[in-house]
Design a protein with these regions (language model features):
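Metallo-beta-lactamase
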Residues: 82-147, 156, 252, 256
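Active-site-proximal loop/helix segment associated with metal-binding centers of metalloenzymes
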Residues: 9-11, 122-192
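Conserved beta-strand hairpin/beta-sheet module of binuclear metal-dependent hydrolase folds
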Residues: 1-43, 147-166
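Active-site metal-binding motif and surrounding structural segment of the metallo-beta-lactamase
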Residues: 34-86
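Active-site neighborhood of phospho(di)ester-bond hydrolases with catalytic His/Asp-centered motifs
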Residues: 27-31, 51-57, 61, 91, ...
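Cap/insert and terminal regions of metallo-dependent hydrolase folds
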Residues: 168-257
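P-loop/Walker A phosphate-binding loop and immediately adjacent motor/lid segment at beta-alpha junctions
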Residues: 69, 73-87, 147-154, 195-223
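Short histidine/acidic/glycine/proline-rich micro-motifs that form metal-
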Residues: 5-7, 60, 88, 94-95, ...
């Protein structure tokens, strides 16, 4: 986990993560700035080895760091220090924004590699793409705030990892979420603190909500992210104490830079 926090956190980084298999890396979202490079470094990864990036939606706590990745990739390509290609996957709205921001903010000697060796790959609802040797099926979560996609990855032996983006589960996602080996789902705050953080008016959920969902849909491992950071030192303990009241599977509340074996 490169980051685990929501948009306005200051004590941890915005939610984004890496999946690695046989030294191949798949990155989902980037957070809000150049600190993503720090997070990648301290996660023990090489940014240059991250050849596949997925962006869920256009909100700046997910998108802006992707422009830094575009800059790094294209700058090193221009210097002759980046062999091969890279891909950024998303829906059309996000890809158009990335292309527009890059052309306005970066040098033409760098942006000339976009759509040549840095491929902006549009994905559609229900489309499956092979990424780092795994079938990844992207799906529209039907957000009412900004068009957003999640994904479900085949991780072998009939198991799947499903990421719902940063909004509560929608019934249209059932075929992807149900029976997942791993579910990555947002939990803005504790249910007991819902009157403090107002998650529902922000179209987010609580620990209780996410855990009840995972229990209902037979999820084996639930990982919560995109949280508040008011009491970060106690977040893991407090979230797990609330969550285990509603969920009998394995509940994970990661810190930034924490990793898990899938």
């Amino acid at each position: 986990m490169l980051g685990t926090g929501n948009a306005l956190v200051t004590e941890c980084y915005n939610t984004c993560f890496l999946i690695e298999d046989r030294k191949q890396w798949f990155m989902t979202d980037g957070g809000g700035g150049s600190a993503v490079l720090h997070q990648i470094k301290h996660a023990g990864a090489d940014w240059m080895a991250i050849r596949h990036i997925f962006v869920t939606h256009k909100h700046i706590d997910h998108l802006i760091a992707i422009i830094w990745m575009v800059r790094m990739i294209c700058q090193f390509m221009n210097h002759g220090d980046y062999p091969g290609d890279a891909c950024i996957y998303s829906h059309k709205e996000v890809l158009d924004l990335i292309r527009d921001l890059a052309n306005k903010l970066l040098l033409s000697k760098e942006t000339r590699f976009i759509d040549d060796r840095l491929h902006l790959v549009e994905v559609h609802d229900g489309e499956t793409v092979s990424i780092i040797g795994h079938d990844v099926t992207f799906f529209d979560i039907r957000s009412t705030k900004a068009k957003q996609f999640g994904f479900s990855m085949d991780i072998g032996d009939g198991r799947k990892l499903t990421c719902c983006g940063d909004e509560p589960y929608n019934d249209c996602e059932e075929q992807y979420v149900k029976n997942s080996e791993w579910l990555m789902h947002e939990a803005f705050c504790l249910y007991s603190q819902r009157d403090i953080f107002d998650p529902y008016e922000k179209h987010h959920s609580t620990v209780k909500d996410a855990c009840e969902l995972a229990e209902k849909l037979n999820v084996k491992n639930l990982l919560l992210y995109h949280t508040e950071d008011r009491n970060l030192a106690e977040r893991k303990r407090l979230y797990q104490e609330e969550g285990i009241q509603y969920y009998r599977g394995n509940l994970f509340v990661p810190d930034d830079l924490e990793s898990f074996e899938l």
